[in-house]
Amino acid sequence: LLLQKNFFVINIDKATYSSNYYNTKEFKDSKKYKFIKFDIKNKNLKNIFFKYKPHGIFNLAAETHVDRSIDSPKNFIKNNIVGTFNLLESFRNYHIKNKNIKLIHISTDEVFGDVLIGRSDENDTYKPSSPYAASKASSDHLVYSYYRTFNIPAIITNCSNNYGPNQHPEKLIPKLIYNILHNLPLPIYGKGSNSREWIYVK
């Protein structure tokens, strides 16, 4: 958006352990970009809406690591469900007088659970198999309920695995590369027979 369109972009980020400021170096000094360190669970989020008057929201905020969700489910429940709820409430209140705003909620294919044959699509039944997937499924249902109940314009996308430059080393592709370079064992999930689609993000 910053490089190709004449938009002013506000990046709201909690800046957790997996954040990487290097990813914004190309445009961090741009007059069309503003970074706000902020937790979307904070009820003052609505103030940012009314101050900057956005036309669109891309909700990529989430705890996303499956293994960590097994060790600490509570963080995923708070950030992915409560965070989405607070975002939706802020969006709903702002949308009352600003009808042009739209929401794109980024979800995951993990909400469909194990796909034993073929592939999953957005019409499949949700069968989350980890606390992470369950928290994202819950946030999806919240978004859909606000779309139906309050008529907010929202789209839910269920993208597959992603990888790219500066990704946190706990993610699979960076972890595999690191382990290969350091002669460490490679992680195998299940029987190692699963296949996944990957999206390259630069």
Predicted feature locations:
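N-terminal Rossmann-like NAD(P)+-binding domain of SDR-like oxidoreductases, especially those catalyzing
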Residues: 1-162
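NAD(P)-dependent short-chain dehydrogenase/reductase
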Residues: 116-119, 129, 141-202
